[in-house]
Amino acid sequence: TTTFLCPQSDAMIGWKRTKPSYEEEYKADAPMSDRSQYGHGYTFPCLFRIGNDGWVLVSETGVDSRYCGSRLSDVSEGNLYTVAFPMAEENNGNGTVAPAFALPGATPWRTITVGDHLKPIVETTVPWDVVSPLYETKHDYRFGRGTWSWILWQDGSINYDDQVRYIDFASAMGYEYALIDNWWDTRIGHQRMKSLVEYARDKGVELFLWYSSSGYWNDIEQGPVNRMDNAIIRKREMKWLQSLGVKGIKVDFFGGDKQETMPVSYTHLTLPTNREV
C-alpha cells in the first residue's frame, strides 16, 4: 500500500504566519511507513493505493459550528492511523484543542470510500449523502465559472482597469463570475466598486469580492481587514454588498481548525445567505 497524503504543516509559520494553509506538497506513491514532513500527520482527504487492487479515500464531512476540524495522525506501529484534533499552536495559541458539546450531540462523519479504480473515488457523493442541510436559504445558489486576475497577475492586478479586462474576459468566455481579490478596498475603493459592479452586470458578469477573515490569528495586512470578525461591522458590510448586487465573497486565511474557528466559518456562510449574497 502506498499513499498520496498532504502533510499537516506547523502552525503559525510561513507567509504572515498563516499556516496551516493546506497547500503543502504530497509525495506520489509514498510508502505507508514514511513519517509526515512536519510530524503532525496529514490533512483530509487522504488517498491510499492498495497495489493493483484499488484505492481508498479517507475523509471527513459534517463539521459544523459545534465541533472542530480533524486530521489524520502520523502512521504508528503496524501501519495504523488515528483521527487527530487540531494542534495547540493553531489560532495563535488561543482556544482549545479538544472539542466539547452538550448532549444530545454528534461528531462529524469520517468516511472511507473504496474503489477498484479512481472513478468511484472522484465521483463519490458520500460527503453530501450522510449529512443534512444546516439551514434554509432565501435564494437558490447559482454555480458557475469565473475569472480571477490574482492567480496570474497577483496583487498588482487589483486595480480598476485590470479588473475591467478580466470582466471583459469572463464575458467573452461566457463565464458567469469574476473574483476581485485582496486590496480592492484601497486600490479600487468602495465608491468605484459600485461602478465596477454595474459595468460587470452590463457585460452579463457578476462579481465576488475577497475579504480577510481578520482576527488575531495571523499577521495579514491585505484588505479588507477587520470586517469579518466583528458582528456589527460584518452585518453592515453585508448590507452594503447586497445594495451593490455583489453575488458572493471569498473569505481567506482562517487561523486553524479549532472549535473556536468553526462558528466564525459558519457565520460567514449563513449571514451572506440571509443578505442574498
Protein language model features and the residues they cover:
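Alpha-helical scaffolding within the catalytic cores
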Residues: 131-134, 161-165, 190-196, 228-237
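Aromatic- and glycine-enriched glycan-recognition loops and surfaces
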Residues: 152-211, 215-216
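Active-site-adjacent beta->alpha loops and helix N-cap segments on the catalytic face
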Residues: 189-193, 259-265
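Active-site-adjacent "subsite" loops/lids of carbohydrate-active enzymes
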Residues: 206-257
